[in-house]
Amino acid sequence: MNSLQVLTKKVLIENKAFSEYHEDDIFILQQLGLWWHNGPIGFCKQCKMVTSGSMSCSDVDSYELDRALVRAVKKNQTDLIKLFVLWGANINYGIICAKTERTKVLCIQLGADPKFLDVGLYNMFIDLIKQQKVLLAIDIYYDNISILDSFDSHDFYVLIDFIYNCFILNLDEKEKMIKNTYVLKFWFKIAIEFNLIKPIRFLSKKFPHLDYWRLKTAVYLGNVDEIHHAYFQENIRLDPNDMMSLACMYPQNKLGIYYCFVLGANINTALETLIGFINHEVNREITFFSNYGIWSNVHFCISLGANPYTKKIQETLLRQEKNVIMKLLFKKGLLSPHSILHKKILEPSEVRKIISTYEYTETFHSFSLLRDNLQ
């Protein structure tokens, strides 16, 4: 026979926590282990979210079940640890964050693999990336010095794809980042890259010192939703031309380039930035086909109205005539502005529609034409 406590906890799986309760009920709820985050605890089985009081599953402060377990483990809250495991939380996430031997032993008793700390850390990191569990990953790794120190330095940077991310992660850093900051910005970047709204809002609230880095990352990755939110709802502003320079550095970044253009960036300056980048990289034998991403940005800037025949650009082209992209730009009249891009729209959903229409009507035909003109 189940005790009242166990039955109550099981019932709460099906029913969200009540928001109306008498002050005298608080003590009873606390004794039953049903009080969490300043309110009666509840669990939405469909969303796998732990709530408190009148909190809804979509609230920024609501917790995914595994995150709730990690929080309880960090605070050595024995009753809550048992409750969250009863509801289906992965206890291996808990043992990683256990700060005391007693809590670690409890995690093992509840089913955690004692070998997980030795053999499971890398696989877990990769799984969290694949599942895009940004907030859970930050809860596990951020400020978890013992776990971060357990990673070999070389393996650590390889693990988070150092070569691919080093530019944007190191942006705004005056000194070499410690692992803790690197982990935070790595997962924050994933949230921005895949437009994970709840993680972005949660991290923005918790780490306001990263506001300008967040906007720069959104521009670099072409996340127009986050650019719009930061720029117009939070009044986080940067010079449009500086933003455009970042947008141009990311391959095939039509969304980012267009948005910076609409915000007031000089499109001729953007083209000069791209040509300068190509000029810098030309010795690496970049070709039209192997550097499609950067060429796509050049082509798009011209479609927005950039003039490839300015004196400054032509002087650069003369020095690098051997490059295929440069040869294309020499063909006067081959590339021209696209009529659909004359509209200046700031609403993210409408921006995506414009770019989608542009790509459908321009890209495939245009590149076929360009190929024919190279013969």
Curated annotation (Swiss-Prot):
Similarity comment? Belongs to the asfivirus MGF 360 family.
What name does UniProt use for this protein? Protein MGF 360-5L
Which biological process terms from the Gene Ontology are attached to this UniProt entry? taxis
Sum up the protein's function in the record's words.
Plays a role in virus cell tropism, and may be required for efficient virus replication in macrophages.
Q: Which Pfam families match?
A: ASFV_360
